C-alpha cells in the first residue's frame, strides 16, 4: 500500500506554501499520514540546513528559485520534493516494517496492541540504526534521516515506532511526551505505556518496560504522570516542533524558520496546539523573531502555553515558565523575568531530583549562576549611571536599573531559591553546592539592605515545631531516600512531605490536581489564576498593623534557616554559603544513591542561540 491518489496530486512541492498545503490536507483527514509528512519535512530540512550545496549529479533533484527578501534582488532556493523521490522513500520504509513484523504472531484482542507487538516494532527500528554515531547530532529526528542515513536521535526513535505502528494499522499506539523524553502509549484508552528508546547520552534503555517506576520516583523526566498523551494531530505538531533550522552554531535557515512558523500557525488555527504547551512556546519564540501581522503577540502565546499546562497537566510543566522568563530576560524586563523564574522553581519544588533530570538541572544552574547574576549586574550598572529604560523599551514596566530598588524583585529572587532548596529535599541526588552559594551571595548583594528589609518572611510556630523533627538521623534518611527503580508499577508517586502552611500565594491548577503551595506571596502578582498574597493576607498578631512590603512564606528548611541572614542589613556571605551547602554535603555522605545510568541532555527543545 503506497501513497493515495489524493496525496499524489499535491506533488511536486516547490515552495513553503506547497508544503503547508500538504499538511493542511493531511490534517483534514482522520489519520494524517505520519510517515509521508516526516519524510517531506526531513527532505526539506536536509537540503536547507544539512547539505546546502546544490548537487549536480542527481538528475531527479531540482531547486526552485524565488526572490529573497535579504539582500534585495537576491534569490533563495527551495528543494523541490518530487513525487518519485518521496514515493520511493515511503515505499522503502513501509516495506521494511511490514516485511519484518508478522502481525499474525501477535493477536490483537479487542483490536488493541499487545506489549510484545509494540516491543517487536521498536526492535525493528532499533536494529536498523547504525551501530555507532553521535546520538545528539542535529537533523536526525525524521524518517528521512532513518531511511537515508540509518540514524535517529532519541525522540526520533520514539516517533519512528509510532509511524511504523501506523503503517501496520495499529491505530491505538500513540506518542507520549514529557519535556525531555518520549515513549508510547497503547491499549484501551491508551492505558498502557512502553519505553521504546533510550534517554541521554548512553545507549542503555528500558525498551518494553512501563514508565510507572519513573512516575513513582517523582522525577521531572516523567512529570509525575502529567505527560502529554498525543493523538495523531499532536504527533504532527511534534514533528513540526522538532524541525531544526540550525545550519551551524550561529546561523539558522530562514526558509525553515518560515516553514515551521507557518505550520505551527496552521496547527494553532485548527486547535491542535491547545494541549501542547511547548509548541505554543516555540511559536511565541518564532513570533518574537518575525511577527506575523494580525496574529497574537508573543506574550499572549507564552501565557497560553502556561494556561495549557495548568488546564491539562496540573501545572506540572517547567518549560512554559522558562519560555516566558527567557522572553522577559531578552527584553530586560527584570521584575517579570524574576517572577517567571520563581514560578519555575515553584513547579520544580514538588519533584525529586534524580540523575535522569540533569537537563533541567542544567537549565536552573545556568539561570541561577549565569543569567540572573548578569541581568542584575547590568541593572546595577544602569542604576549607577542613572540610565533608565522608558516608554516602549520598558514595555510598561519599571526601568531595569530600578528593579534593584524594588522589594518585590528581591522577593521573587528568594522564591526562586526557595523552590530549588525544596526540590532538593527528599531527593536521592543533591542539587546545591558551593557554586550555587557563591552566586546567591552575589545576587543578594545587588539589593541594598533597606530594600531587602522590606520583604517580610513569615515564620509560624507550627512550621517551627515541624522543623525540629525531620532532621534527626532516622527521619532524615526516610526523607532523603526516594523510591527506587524497583517500585511496584502500581504505586502512585508518593507526595513530598508538605509544610503545614501552604501560603496565601498557593496557585491551583485548573485540572484535578491539588493546589500547589508556593513559597512566595508577593503582592500584585498572580499564579494559577489566584491573587498571590499580600501583607493583609498573611496572619499577624491582632495588634500589629500589616507590613507594607511583600510577604514570603518559605517552604524549604534551608531558606527558613537563613531567613534572618537574607534580610540583614549586611550580607554575611560565609554564613549563607555554609547554610546553603551544609545539608547537601551531609546528604552526599549519608545517602548511597543507586543510579541506573548517567542520562543527560536534551530533547524536543530547539537549542537557542542565547536567552
From Swiss-Prot:
Disruption phenotype: Homozygous mice die in utero at 11.5-12.5 dpc. At 9 months of age, heterozygous mice develop pancreatic islet lesions, from hyperplasia to insulin-producing islet cell tumors, and frequently parathyroid adenomas. Larger, more numerous tumors involving pancreatic islets, parathyroids, thyroid, adrenal cortex and pituitary are seen by 16 months. All tumors show loss of the wild-type allele. The modification Phosphothreonine is found at residue 595. Transmembrane segments: none annotated. GO terms for cellular component: chromosome, telomeric region; cytoplasm; histone methyltransferase complex; nucleus; transcription repressor complex. Residues 214-390 are annotated as: Interaction with FANCD2. It holds the Pfam family Menin. One of its GO terms (molecular function) is chromatin binding. The modification Phosphoserine is found at residues 487, 544. Keywords: Chromatin regulator, DNA-binding, Nucleus, Phosphoprotein, Repressor, Transcription, Transcription regulation. Residues 484-500 have a biased composition (Basic and acidic residues). It is found in: Nucleus. Its main location: nucleus. Widely expressed, with high levels in hippocampus, cerebral cortex, testis and thymus (at protein level). Also expressed at high levels in pancreatic islets, ovary and bone marrow. In the brain, highest expression in hippocampus pyramidal nerve cells (at protein level). In the testis, may be expressed in spermatogonia (at protein level). Low expression, if any, in skeletal muscle. Residues 460-553 are annotated as: Disordered. It comes from the Eukaryota. One of its GO terms (biological process) is positive regulation of osteoblast differentiation. Component of the MLL-HCF complex, at least composed of KMT2A/MLL1, MEN1, ASH2L, RBBP5, DPY30, WDR5, HCFC1 and HCFC2. Component of the menin-associated histone methyltransferase complex, at least composed of KMT2B/MLL4, MEN1, ASH2L, RBBP5, DPY30 and WDR5. Interacts with POLR2B. Interacts with POLR2A phosphorylated at 'Ser-5', but not with the unphosphorylated, nor 'Ser-2' phosphorylated POLR2A forms. Interacts with FANCD2 and DBF4. Interacts with SMAD3, but not with SMAD2, nor SMAD4. Directly interacts with NFKB1, NFKB2 and RELA. Essential component of a MLL/SET1 histone methyltransferase (HMT) complex, a complex that specifically methylates 'Lys-4' of histone H3 (H3K4). Functions as a transcriptional regulator. Binds to the TERT promoter and represses telomerase expression. Plays a role in TGFB1-mediated inhibition of cell-proliferation, possibly regulating SMAD3 transcriptional activity. Represses JUND-mediated transcriptional activation on AP1 sites, as well as that mediated by NFKB subunit RELA. Positively regulates HOXC8 and HOXC6 gene expression. This is Menin. The gene is Men1.
